[in-house]
């Protein structure tokens, strides 16, 4: 049986892009959210929660453990790297790509809305209950992350429409950051 097992303790806003990809690319595969195979990955604080998410690809009697690191900083989470067979990373350095054999540079991603606000709340509640024994993240923080996709993100269809190409125009999508450093540096370049 072809199956994807996903750790329910994922940061939904950052994982939504990849969840959409899994759903679209692996049509017909069974998708299961289960914390059991991921108990060894600790989620004790916000940094752990923000690190990314794990899933296992089961096909033809073989299993491949994948961790997707969605952090903006070029930091390898060693415990997650040791756990997985493939470590996908959004922002690695050239040196990291050479040094870490399991590391694959996957490029940027962005959060997308995957359903109505009601269905998102139901999904949040279900996945929180599945992973709560193995996470210190509060339900309030978990729910805030899920609802962020409905409040601040758009469905993928909003990005897939035909558009006229303007030769003197560069498309850039990002969110302004709300901290002291961002006000003086990052946001100025956005």
PLM regions with names:
Residues 56-185:
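Catalytic core of nucleotide-activated saccharide and alditol-phosphate transferases
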Residues 1-77, 81, 92, 172-187:
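N-terminal pre-catalytic "stem/leader" segment of glycosyltransferase-like enzymes
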């Amino acid at each position: 049986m072809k199956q994807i097992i996903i750790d329910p303790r994922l940061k939904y806003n950052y994982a939504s892009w990849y969840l959409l990809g899994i759903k679209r690319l692996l049509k017909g595969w069974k998708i299961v959210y289960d914390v059991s195979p991921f108990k060894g990955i600790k989620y004790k604080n916000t940094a752990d929660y923000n690190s990314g998410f794990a899933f296992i690809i089961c096909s033809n009697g073989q299993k491949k453990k994948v961790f997707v690191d969605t952090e903006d900083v070029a930091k390898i989470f060693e415990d997650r790297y040791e756990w997985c067979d493939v470590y996908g990373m959004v922002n690695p350095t050239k040196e990291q790509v050479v040094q870490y054999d399991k590391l694959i540079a996957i490029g940027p991603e962005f959060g997308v809305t995957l359903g109505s606000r009601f269905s998102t709340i139901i999904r949040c509640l279900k996945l929180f209950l599945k992973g709560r024994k193995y996470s210190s993240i509060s339900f309030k923080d978990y729910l805030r992350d899920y609802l962020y996709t409905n409040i601040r993100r758009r469905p993928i269809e909003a990005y897939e429409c035909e558009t006229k190409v303007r030769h003197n125009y560069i498309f850039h999508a990002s969110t302004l950051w709300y901290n002291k450093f961002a006000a003086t540096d990052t946001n100025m370049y956005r």
